[in-house]
Each structure stands twice: as C-alpha cells, then as structure tokens.
Amino acid sequence: MTTVVILAGGKSERMGQDKALILGGVERIQKLVNQIGEYRIITLCGDKEREPLFSGEVWPDPIHCDCLARVIDWVIEKIDDDILFVPCDMYNLGIDGLTQLMVQPNCVAVDENEVRQPLLCHISDKSLLRNSKTLSEKFANFPSIECLDFVNQYSNFNYQEDLIDHLLQ
C-alpha cells in the first residue's frame, strides 16, 4: 500500500499567498489521488493553527523538527507503507503524471527544465535515503523518473510570475 503525503506547510512568502489554497491546491491533489484509487492521504499542514484549513487526515509539523528535511524524516519514521510525497504547488499535475509516479518505485520526478524535484518522490526502499538536512542530498540515491510525457506536470510554482504564466497558457 502507498500513503500519499501532501506537503502544505510552507509559508509561501515568495508567492505572496498560500500555495496550498491556490487553484484548488491540496483539495485538487486529494481528488486526483482518489480518482486513481483507494489510498491513505495525509496533509502535512505546517503549524498546528493551519490544521482547520484542510480536510481529511491532517498532521502538523512536530515542534522538534527544525527544517523540512527533518519533517520528512519524521513522516518516514511514522509510516510503514510506501510513501508518495506531493507538494501542494504542483498545479500542472494530472492523473496520468500522478499514476506514473505511483507505479514507479523509488523515484524522484524531473521537471520540464530537467531539474530534480525531490519533494515529488515515491519512496519504497527507505534504506536509499541519506541522513542529510538538504533535500537534494537526502534523495541523492533515488533514480530520476524522466518521463518526457509528464515533465510539464512535475513543475512546482514558487513565484507569482510562475502562476501568471501558467494561467495565461
């Protein structure tokens, strides 16, 4: 079984608004996952005050975790299943791109700019993870999933300009 963990705890300072709520955000990803099949879905919400923003199973970040890499470690320790991490700002992600990640064990997605997206990954073998505070190093042992049909779905959005470009397409 695979547990899908939606990452929705960021401050979205560069975007200027809460990325978890833009264009359906977390709710849209939950719907995509449910269209594919029956999966446990957990939304990591960041601060406890953000819990009411989301439906379903919602976990606040533990206080003892000082960075996202440590939050990822904490989640991995708590979940025995395979884990598919999905950032809430994957606004192009569709069913076919998500399905491709579900069926590919131990992979990190690569976006249309050929950049690895370590937070969009499928973990089946936890022994491949490295102990590191940097995400790129933590997932360095995971092969890239370079599926040309879906690279445009594997891009995240960090700036308002990214979102404007997306909306104008």
Label the model's feature ranges.
Residues 158-169:
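Short amphipathic alpha-helical segments
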Residues 1-115, 130-135, 141-153, 161-163:
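Nucleotide and nucleotide-moiety/phosphate-recognizing core
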Residues 117-123, 156:
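Short glycine- and hydrophobic/aromatic-rich loop-to-beta-strand nucleating segment
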Residues 123-135, 167-169:
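Aromatic-glycine-rich donor-binding/catalytic loop that engages nucleotide-sugar donors
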